Amino acid sequence: MKEYKVMAHIHSLNGEMAEITVLDKVGDNDYIVDYKGVKCHALFNWFVCEYYADDIYGIIKE
């Protein structure tokens, strides 16, 4: 999958929008993303066509 940048709702910003980089798709609507150097999970909501990145509880530790 080719990486791409997109705006997303960020958990640590209380849902405010910021730019993320989508790195990989790991499920039907589950993605690995990078937000300011932090790899975390993000969900894509097909009803509103927006990403929701969880940079608090969804952090991926390598």
Model features per residue range: what roles?
Residues 1-3, 58-62:
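Short intrinsically disordered terminal tails
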